From Swiss-Prot:
Domain of life: Bacteria
Function of the molecule: The transhydrogenation between NADH and NADP is coupled to respiration and ATP hydrolysis and functions as a proton pump across the membrane.
Cellular-component GO terms for this entry: plasma membrane
Name of the featured protein: NAD(P) transhydrogenase subunit alpha part 2
Membrane topology: Multi-pass membrane protein
Transmembrane as UniProt keyword: yes
Disulfide bonds: none
Protein localization: Cell inner membrane
Assembly behavior: Complex of an alpha and a beta chain; in Rickettsia, the alpha chain seems to be made of two subunits.
């Protein structure tokens, strides 16, 4: 019976130590979550990186293709530009009159349309060369 108060005192110390460790662990988890949130990649840097890599890949694909495959490459480029035109028109209609997305969508529609019409002209000239 004399050991009961000693065991109660030890249990209280263990509970106190467990509570202290729990509080420290909670602080560590909060600090870790703050550190992971501050080390994320900026979306603008990510988008610019993808743009630069896509530019290099596109450059090497276009310049390394054999001349016999230029016409199919032009048709694929026209198809991709058609998808861009549709997407940019959706961007124009999904916002109000003078928001950034509508202006960017209008600019994308203009550039993709120029690309499509230029592609058709170049493809027509290439096909006329094969007729001769």
């Amino acid at each position: 019976m004399n050991q009961l108060p000693i065991m109660a005192k030890q249990a209280a110390e263990i509970a106190s130590n467990a509570q202290e460790l729990s509080n420290k662990l909670k602080d560590l988890v909060i600090d870790a979550s703050w550190q992971t949130n501050t080390n994320t990649i900026d979306p603008l840097v990510f988008a610019i990186t993808i743009f630069v890599l896509a530019s290099f890949v596109g450059y090497y694909v276009v310049w390394k293709v054999t001349p016999a495959l230029h016409t199919p490459l032009m048709s694929i480029t026209n198809a991709i530009s058609g998808i861009i035109v549709i997407s940019s028109m959706i961007a124009i209609t999904s916002s109000s009159a003078f928001e950034f997305s509508s202006l960017l969508g209008s600019f994308a529609t203009l550039l993709a349309s120029i690309n499509i019409f230029g592609g058709f002209i170049v493809t027509t000239r290439m096909l006329e060369m094969f007729k001769k």
